[in-house]
Amino acid sequence: MAKEKTVYVCSNCGQESPKWVGKCPSCGEWNTYVEEIVRKETTNRRPVSGIETQKAKPVILSEIEADDEPRINMHDDELNRVLGGGLVPGSLVLIGGEPGIGKSTLVMQTILRMPDKKILYVSGEESARQLKLRADRLSEVSSDCLIVCETSLEQIYVHIKNTSPDLVIIDSIQTISTENIESSPGSIAQVRECSASILRFAKETHTPVLLIGHINKEGSIAGPKVLEHIVDTVLQFEGDQHYMYRILRSIKNRFGSTAELGIYEMRQDGLRQVSNPSELLLSQDHEGMSGVAIASAIEGVRPFLIETQALVSSAVYGNPQRSATGFDIRRMNMLLAVLEKRVGFKLAQKDVFLNIAGGLKVNDPAIDLAVISAILSSNMDAAVEPEVCMAGEIGLS
């Protein structure tokens, strides 16, 4: 017989409380506590997976064989780079991103390139027919890719037991629910319980699992922060839907570096790997145009060239406007203050607009020199030589 109890869980960080509170004491957010009903079993229950596994036994550390196990080749150079050289067997990987950014497309075209692996694709958002249409659009078909549309965690384990796949894809974790939790799919308790169960399955059976997750309005993975702590690797798929490029960034990686990133170009037939991102980010028609400067920046450990565009004009509507796209507006205001105080350029009564071409968001301070060069170029209406590439941080002194 199961006992029920009511708890309140913060939808932002996963902090639990026996009663509702207005402000979360853990993350400081307001009105984020939601009611959850949790059943506590009075008897020992069987594992949700129902898959027979060996019980763990203590072993001597020096007797453990630590041979490097070969990683699974994903047949995608950018994805392999971000994962740290490939997918580690028995690992749990979470891929997050905005709706429609291309997460399912990235995973689908990757698994279709793996004919040597038996893959089970579990979809909780699309039907089998919709997945077939997506695969046809990608022009790649694998005979060893199995599709199942299911949202029950218990039934997913049944399909895994019957098929014995080499790799499991779950799209998405917010649609999966377990019978042990009396709450709707996507709730804090469901996401946490399902993720913890899937992690135990991956470790016990040595089967890698890829989870696809959504992000909330703050840009973090939807669900409790404990979800990011549960999984082995967290990959963020970023980009603007109005631009054709996408960036795959590693936020957490227990088996590799978090400094790597992969760049893709969105096309009608799927995502194309971009080995030289400078070709994608630089335009070819800016020669002789004022307000344009080329900068050398580093994202992760990959250096590439970006185009910095600026427009300076007289303020017409009273207070001058300051706008920056892809660059920190506060840092731009600091650079404008340095120009006025240290160099003597009077920009207090000018509108200043800054844009990083391609929609890229850059935090590298090495592009400061290119930013002020583009601003001065636009203010003086004098073009910067197209062969000049700039890199340098600007200080207050």
Segments the model singles out, each with a brief description of its role:
Residues E126, T151-S152:
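Short beta->alpha linker loops
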Residues A2-N12, E16-R81, V88-L94, I101-I111, ...:
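Peripheral, non-AAA+ core regions of ATP-driven protein-machinery
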Residues E98, G124:
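P-loop (Walker A) phosphate-binding loop of NTP-binding proteins
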